[in-house]
Amino acid sequence: MNHDPFSWGRPADSTYGAYNTQIANAGASPMVNTQQPIVTGTSVISMKYDNGVIIAADNLGSYGSLLRFNGVERLIPVGDNTVVGISGDISDMQHIERLLKDLVTENAYDNPLADAEEALEPSYIFEYLATVMYQRRSKMNPLWNAIIVAGVQSNGDQFLRYVNLLGVTYSSPTLATGFGAHMANPLLRKVVDRESDIPKTTVQVAEEAIVNAMRVLYYRDARSSRNFSLAIIDKNTGLTFKKNLQVENMKWDFAKDIKGYGTQKI
């Protein structure tokens, strides 16, 4: 009698060939989750102003230090009054984008109030994403992203919140991810430092501050791109999405004063 359990109840190998036992065995190595991001997007920056919120991100996907993919859109509109900006791993960003599309589809399916009383608010979308990020972190398989959710609530309040790969969340009148948290945020805080500064700031002033911060990031961040997208969510005019913008009016004269630049001697 053949005592091999893989042989019970099946013809002999001479009839149908040897049985592949690998499908019933564990892998030779333990399962390994993503250890570090591969193709990444850099900073997302945002700020509140008197009637809404403004958010911007460039369109570059970097393969390590290689500026590999152009035209990567990292601002994702969700509904009519929310934009989600994502930095970090591009493949994880695409997964989050699919989750958001499924969320919109599920909310709209057989729901005549999907564009009215039961429309997706920015706060709903943020709570969903914060839960997803914390759940993946708790499984020791995080989505390697930092996310900013910007929008205007149905009552007219500005909404701007941040969540990262650990599920850490916070809010501020100005928010930035990545290198922008070090380089852009101080510039934006010169315009809007506290909640009390928001009613004094017009959309023109806010947009000028964002564009200037994108220029500084292009100067200083080796993973940034000249091309960027900008979205304005206004409680009066709704969502305005500007694509294919470029950093303009650059002045590189300051480079000669940077130690280590070019052929100068230190």
Curated annotation (Swiss-Prot):
Propeptide: 1-33
Broad class of the protein's primary localization: cytoplasm
Purpose: Non-catalytic component of the proteasome which degrades poly-ubiquitinated proteins in the cytoplasm and in the nucleus. It is essential for the regulated turnover of proteins and for the removal of misfolded proteins. The proteasome is a multicatalytic proteinase complex that is characterized by its ability to cleave peptides with Arg, Phe, Tyr, Leu, and Glu adjacent to the leaving group at neutral or slightly basic pH. It has an ATP-dependent proteolytic activity. PRE3 and PRE4 are necessary for the peptidyl-glutamyl-peptide-hydrolyzing activity.
Oligomeric and partner information: The 26S proteasome consists of a 20S proteasome core and two 19S regulatory subunits. The 20S proteasome core is composed of 28 subunits that are arranged in four stacked rings, resulting in a barrel-shaped structure. The two end rings are each formed by seven alpha subunits, and the two central rings are each formed by seven beta subunits. The catalytic chamber with the active sites is on the inside of the barrel. Interacts with CIC1.
Cited PROSITE patterns: PROTEASOME_BETA_1, PROTEASOME_BETA_2
Keyword Metal-binding applies: no
InterPro entries (alphabetical): Ntn_hydrolases_N, Proteasome_beta4, Proteasome_bsu_CS, Proteasome_sua/b, Proteasome_suB-type
Locations listed in the record: Cytoplasm; Nucleus
CDD domains: proteasome_beta_type_4 (cd03760)
Keyword Nucleus: yes
Lineage: Eukaryota, Fungi, Dikarya, Ascomycota, Saccharomycotina
Gene Ontology BP annotations: proteasomal ubiquitin-independent protein catabolic process; proteasome assembly; proteasome-mediated ubiquitin-dependent protein catabolic process
Keywords: Cytoplasm, Nucleus, Proteasome
Miscellaneous remark of the record: Present with 16900 molecules/cell in log phase SD medium.
Protein name from the UniProt record: Proteasome subunit beta type-7
Family: Belongs to the peptidase T1B family.
Superkingdom of the source species: Eukaryota
Gene Ontology CC terms: cytosol; nucleus; proteasome complex; proteasome core complex, beta-subunit complex; proteasome storage granule
